[in-house]
Amino acid sequence: LNFALFWIIFYCLLAVPIMENFGDSSVFTFLFLLLFAIIITGFIKKYKLTDKYGLDGFPKDPKRYLYFIPVWILATGNLWGGLSLSYSGLSQLWAVLSMILIAYIEEIIFRGFLFKALLTKEGVKNAIIIVGVTFGIGHIVNIFVGQANFDTLVQIIFAIAWGFILVTIFYKSKSLIPGIIGHGLINAFS
């Protein structure tokens, strides 16, 4: 559990000031997130933890894919009212790539590290609840990067709901890959 909490706190302490100073459409934010993703992936590979944390590929049982279809459809919800770009030029590219990296990192530290740590101590039901709520409340840091209070509150509520969905998919499928894709789509389309 301490290991998971370390990564969550470490990520927040580094990401918040970078996002606050540069925004999510900056090449500096993208490079920080890329470096963080490389470090966390390197750690997992070095200690041969890809299987434990669900990064060794898609589930082997094709029936498990049925869980992903509704999630990936819902993940496109931000597009249902039409596509509107938030930035122009390279700023849009950096923002989209940053959002995908944020999804990758958050899936590993919340669904991978935290859920796996809680699973043995708290059991499935409690671990799912704790991770879902923790993930949602974790979005409160967006207040510190300039997001409006009401928008952050709405984001927290949606993040709690998505947190439950994504951790349940990870538990059922034993793979973080579908959650990374779904979370990445949600972030990229927001």
Label each region the model flagged.
Residues 105-132, 168-175:
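Membrane-interface helix/loop boundary segments of multi-pass membrane proteins
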Residues 12-21, 77-87, 140-146:
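Juxtamembrane "helix-exit" motif on the non-cytosolic side of transmembrane helices
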